[in-house]
Amino acid sequence: MIDYPININNVSGNSVINVGGAFMIRPLTLSKSVFGSGGLNTGIVFENNFVSKAKMINHQFTDQNVTKTF
């Protein structure tokens, strides 16, 4: 498989991402079920098929510089 970066074409108002230029995608899905007003709240359920080809190694030590303001 050729390692090309994924090109995100747009993000619509309901947070649907249109992905173009990807050879194969193995997504992570999220779902939340709520019944009534706070009753039977099961929280967020994560599902993953563990076949993702994404490289999760990050060689950065900090993502954002922290500055103190007075």
Swiss-Prot record:
Pfam family name, one: gerPA
Coiled-coil regions listed in the entry: none
Family in the record: Belongs to the GerPA/GerPF family.
Name the UniProt record assigns to this protein: Spore germination protein-like protein YpzD
PANTHER family for the chain: SPORE GERMINATION PROTEIN-LIKE PROTEIN YDZR, SPORE GERMINATION PROTEIN-LIKE PROTEIN YDZR-RELATED
Spans traversing the lipid bilayer: none
